[in-house]
From Swiss-Prot:
Converts 2C-methyl-D-erythritol 2,4-cyclodiphosphate (ME-2,4cPP) into 1-hydroxy-2-methyl-2-(E)-butenyl 4-diphosphate. The lineage of its organism: Bacteria, Pseudomonadati, Pseudomonadota, Gammaproteobacteria, Pseudomonadales. Binds 1 [4Fe-4S] cluster. One of its GO terms (biological process) is isopentenyl diphosphate biosynthetic process, methylerythritol 4-phosphate pathway. This is 4-hydroxy-3-methylbut-2-en-1-yl diphosphate synthase (flavodoxin). SUPFAM superfamilies: Inosine monophosphate dehydrogenase (IMPDH) (SSF51412), Nitrite and sulphite reductase 4Fe-4S domain-like (SSF56014). It catalyses: (2E)-4-hydroxy-3-methylbut-2-enyl diphosphate + oxidized [flavodoxin] + H2O + 2 H(+) = 2-C-methyl-D-erythritol 2,4-cyclic diphosphate + reduced [flavodoxin]. [4Fe-4S] cluster binds at residues 270, 273, 305, 312. The keyword Oxidoreductase applies. Keywords: 4Fe-4S, Iron, Iron-sulfur, Isoprene biosynthesis, Metal-binding, Oxidoreductase. Its EC number is 1.17.7.3.
Length: 369
């Protein structure tokens, strides 16, 4: 039952991606991206619905050509979550998805083409209240910056970003967010730190091409954790070569660990040892699978023995500490003794009861407020 996060977030301009606020005092938004063929409308809608069920706030969809733009329009009509269209090179695609109701455009003004084309995209965005995301990536820096710096560097990433920022600002457009991504953690962190001092717009955080589920999770947690702990970042995307739903889960787990945002169960569990009185690993696996549907923020401690068990259990909404018999704590107080028989079923029941109680209490506070 930990309190608010001690992190003081960087002040930034608030923009709106559909119904989702980004920046300012808004919660840090969790994003993901579809990896289906955009032209396969049914598959893409199904994936977006799965992402929404997992708690995603914003979904990015690649729109490589005009056929995909038309498919994007059909997808937009079939989902509720705000959609970002990822567009490169052809400004006409951006203009078309703007007509079709896109919630945000992800572009680089530098690869859209001539000034008149950039102006046309910006005018369309302004007229429809559509924000733009400037996305700079170490793998696709401008040739002159590659020549100037010799290789991708934090300074090169920021110089590229500021070029695009100035481009939009010359056109009197301020509703944008910026990312400066790299697959190298130190490069990305340094670039975001530099950029955070230069602009007031919200920052979209990510470690690009982070890797598979395990390695990508670790790299993203390290890199984004460093920045978020410093108050930098308004929206995050965990880039994984895995099911996009896993990106959402990892994103929320990172935010939970820093007490920046809560959704669902925050498990505190020991790695287990020979002192355990029940199978901690098996118990955790079963509970995580069974309780994925719960959205109410709860701290649940699952500790296998009495060394650290009582201390952790007392700090959680519900805690289980191993013993003979095992002991359940509710709101920091011993409440019930349990044997290993039916342990998971009983613990699930208690957690669901506590979640319902907390949801009702939270709703009551909102109504009274």
């Amino acid at each position: 039952m930990h309190g608010e996060s001690p992190i003081k977030r960087r002040e930034s301009r608030k923009i709106w991606v559909g119904s989702v606020p980004v920046g300012g005092d808004a919660p840090i938004a969790v994003q993901s991206m579809t990896n289906s063929d955009t032209n396969d409308v049914a598959a893409t809608v199904a994936q977006i619905n799965r992402l929404e069920a997992a708690g995603v706030d914003i979904v990015r969809v690649s729109v490589p050509d005009m056929d995909a733009a038309e498919a994007f329009g059909r997808i937009k009509q079939l989902v509720k979550v705000p959609l970002v269209a990822d567009i490169h090179f052809d400004h006409r695609i951006a203009l078309r998805v703007a007509e079709l109701g896109v919630d945000c455009l992800r572009i680089n003004p530098g690869n859209i083409g001539r000034e008149d084309r950039v102006r046309a995209v910006v005018d369309a965005a302004r007229d429809r209240g559509i924000p733009i995301r400037i996305g700079v990536n170490a793998g696709s820096l401008e040739k002159d910056l590659q020549k100037k710096y010799g290789e991708p560097t934090p300074e090169a990433l920021v110089e590229s970003a500021l070029r695009h920022v100035e481009h939009l600002q010359r056109l009197n457009f301020q509703d944008f967010k910026v990312s400066v991504k790299a697959s190298d953690v130190f490069m990305a962190v340094a670039a975001y730190r530099l950029l955070a001092k230069e602009i007031v717009q919200p920052l979209h955080l990510g470690i690009t091409e982070a890797g598979g589920l395990r390695s990508g999770t670790v790299k993203s947690a390290v890199g984004l954790g460093m920045l978020l702990a410093e108050g930098i970042g308004d929206t995050i995307r965990i880039s994984l070569a895995a099911d996009p739903v896993e990106e959402v889960k990892v994103g929320y787990d990172i935010l939970k660990s820093l007490r920046l945002r809560s959704r669902g169960i925050n498990f505190i569990a020991c790695p287990s040892c020979s002192r355990q009185n029940f199978d901690v690993v098996k118990t955790m696996n079963e509970l995580e699978g069974r309780l994925e549907d719960l959205l109410v923020p709860l701290d649940v401690a699952v500790i296998g023995c009495v060394v650290n068990g009582p201390g952790e259990a007392k700090e959680a909404h519900i805690g289980l500490t191993g013993g003979t018999p095992n002991l359940i704590y509710i709101d920091g107080k011993p409440a019930q003794k349990l044997t290993n028989d039916n342990l998971v079923n009983e613990l699930e029941r208690l957690i669901r009861e506590k979640a319902a109680e907390k949801a009702e209490a939270d709703a009551s506070v909102i109504v009274r407020g």
